Amino acid sequence: AVVNQDGELDVSGGGHGIDITGDSATVDNKGGMTVADADSIGIQIDGDKAVVNNDGDNAISNGGTGTQVNGDEATVNNNGNTTVDGKDSTGTEINGDKAIVNNDGDSTILDGGTGTRITGDDATANNSGNTTVDGQGSTGTEIAGNNAVVNQDGELDVSGGGHGIDITGDSATVDNKGGMTVTDPDSIGIQIDGDKAVVNNDGDNAISNGAPARRLTATKHREQ
């Protein structure tokens, strides 16, 4: 299936804007997306090898989900800017192995929201845009699975007790080239809970007001 969404996609009341069941689906969403409450989903795909291109800006709030894919080998390209505001709100959610999420636009995650959430092994998140995370329970990129890779090329700004990158699983790799600013107690730039983690911090890091930059809970890890 191929769906071309050129107009604005506005979803509320627990509805789904686009709902596809089947493998190798493609959604080209050029018009932007607003998802305004719990159980509402902008784009949902159940199937393997899905491709979603979000070229417009996304605004997700009040427990809604922008893009959800349940299946392996999914690719989601968020080229526009994304704002996720509120507990249980999620910009992009993928449940499956070998997922790829490319966040080329800037992401702003507030008040308990999550920008990208992937549950599955061999996931890759490429954050080329800047990521701002503010508030308790807020997370920029969250991955649960082994062999996760996060490439943070844009700036990462974490405050108010949020987490920039949070990975649970073994053999995770984080390449942070964009620099990181972490302020306030309980705020964490990069957190990894698992064995054999590798963190490469090539950008400038500024840590203030009692915040830890990196928290790695692992029996083996190497930082460069």
Task: Annotate each language-model stretch with its function.
Residues 1-13, 25-39, 51-63, 75, ...:
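Beta-strand-rich solenoid/repeat architectures in extracellular/passenger domains
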Residues 16-23, 41-46, 65-72, 87-97, ...:
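Glycine-rich beta-solenoid repeat tracts in large extracellular/virion proteins
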Residues 52, 93, 101, 122-124, ...:
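Short polybasic linear motifs
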